[in-house]
């Protein structure tokens, strides 16, 4: 399949090396900034600037990241790369924390009313507006794929497992709900995320912890398998250790979006424009999304399922209610991701179109979300992976070349 070949080319060793190398360089230059995250957050102060509150900003950014990647993406990583993929998701998150810190520091330094996120630091910091335009183009395409179609496609598939419904009718409803929400701008998006995300995250966390507690005796073997398969220490795992790395990094990035450049666009809406504050909160988001939530998902699956199914794992706790519960969680996480990614796509489209035709983009974006209810999930996932990778290249290049500006 042509899409699969393109995907394998984009996500080859070159991009994985670039992600890890850039994250490692920033980690070294900033003296392991990841471990100072709590102190940076607690010493941040309220700003008098207009914009989203810090809590709304974090909910919007975290909601954008916490979509299907935390549930279906983690299950997919385990199915394709084995337990070893979990280790490489941790590695991607550790270096990803450094990446998002650098992204947000640079964005806060260079952003203005017209330029936001990577478009700002690639244009004003690096002096390369062409690279900023390329990034914006890939971001628009990623928003239409990963940001909308993938999320709704996965939710629609899960919904069909527990209810008989008309996909075309669902598409119409999705179009209306998404369109009406995103038309309200960052304030309405932030309010929706602030209302939905905390309760959904708390419920999902409690259920996963309960599943893990029920099967607690399996944890030592699970952790042993994670490290053994990550490095191919067992003969049976030797053939998949390299693939576990690739899948783990890819699914980790799909979940936390570190290195893609979406985080600084979202944080540019915050009232507090302190580079250090936005960098610290963005690190927390990657930690919570991947180190915490994806690990809980992986542990629950490895403890309670033989076929890498989140619903099957949760059934040991919720019984027949497991499928409706996971479907509801997917629905909330997916919706938060869709409305958050609209903001990224809209700002990128505005950069390309010089602020024109935003209404047209809004309608097209809502339509792409609606199409997710009827399109084949495999092709949508492949396209999303491709645009994720293409979006990362210009952003990572900018981070490497501006790394000394992060230190100042």
Stretches with model-predicted labels:
Residues 1-68, 78-84, 96, 213, ...:
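N-terminal alpha-helical transmembrane segments of multi-pass membrane transport
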Residues 14, 30-34, 69-74, 83, ...:
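Transmembrane helix-loop junctions in multi-pass membrane proteins
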Residues 18-39, 153-159, 165-214, 219, ...:
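Membrane-interface loop-to-helix entry segments
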Residues 22-27, 92-112, 119, 123-153, ...:
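Helix-loop-helix module between adjacent transmembrane segments
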Residues 32-53, 76-78, 82-86, 98-126, ...:
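Flexible loop linkers connecting adjacent transmembrane helices
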Residues 49-54, 82-89, 120-124, 129-135, ...:
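Membrane-interface alpha-helices at helix entry/exit sites of multi-pass transporters
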Residues 57-115, 124-125, 279-303:
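Membrane-interface helix-loop-helix modules in multi-pass membrane proteins
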């Amino acid at each position: 399949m042509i899409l699969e070949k393109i995907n394998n080319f984009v996500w080859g060793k070159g991009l994985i090396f670039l992600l890890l190398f850039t994250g490692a360089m920033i980690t070294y230059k900033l003296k392991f900034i990841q471990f100072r995250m709590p102190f940076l957050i607690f010493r941040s102060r309220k700003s008098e600037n207009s914009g989203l509150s810090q809590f709304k900003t974090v909910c919007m950014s975290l909601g954008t990241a916490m979509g299907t990647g935390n549930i279906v993406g983690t299950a997919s990583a385990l199915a394709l790369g084995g337990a070893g993929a979990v280790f490489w998701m941790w590695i991607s998150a550790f270096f990803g924390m450094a990446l998002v810190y650098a992204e947000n520091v640079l964005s806060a330094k260079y952003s203005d009313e017209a330029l936001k996120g990577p478009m700002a630091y690639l244009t004003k910091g690096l002096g390369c507006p062409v690279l900023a335009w390329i990034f914006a183009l890939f971001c628009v395409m990623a928003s239409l794929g990963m940001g909308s179609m993938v999320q709704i496609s996965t939710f629609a598939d899960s919904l069909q497992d527990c209810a008989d419904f008309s996909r075309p009718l669902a598409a119409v409803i999705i179009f209306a709900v998404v369109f009406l929400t995103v038309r309200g701008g960052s304030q309405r998006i932030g309010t929706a995320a602030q209302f939905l995300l905390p309760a959904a995250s708390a419920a999902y966390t409690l259920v996963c912890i309960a599943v893990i507690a029920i099967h607690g005796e399996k944890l030592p073997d699970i952790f042993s398998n994670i490290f053994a398969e990550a490095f191919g220490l067992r003969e049976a795992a030797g053939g998949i250790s390299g693939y576990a790395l690739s899948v783990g990094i890819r699914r980790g990035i799909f979940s936390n979006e570190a290195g893609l450049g979406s985080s600084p666009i979202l944080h540019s809406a915050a009232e507090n424009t302190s580079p250090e504050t936005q960098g610290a909160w963005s690190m927390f988001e990657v930690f919570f999304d991947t180190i915490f939530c994806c690990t809980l998902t992986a542990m629950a699956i490895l403890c309670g399922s033989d076929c890498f199914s989140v619903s099957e794992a949760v059934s040991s706790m919720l019984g027949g209610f497991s499928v409706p519960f996971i479907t509801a969680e997917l629905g909330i996480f997916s919706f938060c991701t869709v409305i958050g990614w609209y903001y990224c796509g809209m700002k990128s489209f505005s950069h390309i179109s010089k602020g024109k035709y935003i209404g047209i983009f809004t309608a097209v974006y809502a339509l792409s979300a609606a199409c997710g209810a009827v399109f084949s999930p495999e092709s949508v996932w492949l396209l999303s992976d491709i645009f994720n990778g293409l979006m990362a290249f210009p952003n990572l290049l900018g981070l490497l070349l501006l790394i000394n500006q992060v230190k100042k």
